[in-house]
Structures are given as C-alpha cells and as structure tokens.
Amino acid sequence: MMITLFIDASAYPSPRDLHASLKRMLSLPDYYGMNADALYECLSERREPVHLWIYSSGEGDTARSLSTVCAVIRELGGTVRTIGPERSEPV
C-alpha cells in the first residue's frame, strides 16, 4: 500500500504550517516534532511509502522545508513528482 499526498506549498505561510498539514494528512503522532528529522523518524516506523505530488513548492523557508521533506520521502523509498506550473522537482 502507498500513501498519496497532494501539496500546494504556496498555501503554507511557514514551514511549521507545512509540517502541521503533513501531521494531519499522515496521521502522525502527537509527539511529531514538526521538522524533517521528526518526519524521518515517524515515517521510518511505517511500512508504506509516501507518494508526494507537488503543485507548487512555495517560497522562502517553506520551499526549503519542502525540499527537505522531499529528500526524506525519497530516502524512505517514496516518490516525489511536480504536477503544477513549476514542472520540476524541488532540489
């Protein structure tokens, strides 16, 4: 089984808002630390990979945070694709 998420990071004014949304969408535990290290820890405890579709990677700190989230997802065997106007994967 694979978990599929669709994200428009331009809707999140801060990295914390992005992580709060990930916490909700992925049903992460209350102790989730709202950062990439905590995301790695929580997702590595699961068996199902995450498939992330990105409409927009956002700007500034949110874009940098999303880039780190993408790296975590890829490292754990998931995939990341861009479907919006940017049409390129985050760095």
What do the PLM-derived regions correspond to, one by one?
Residues 1-91:
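Positively charged, polar, low-complexity stretches
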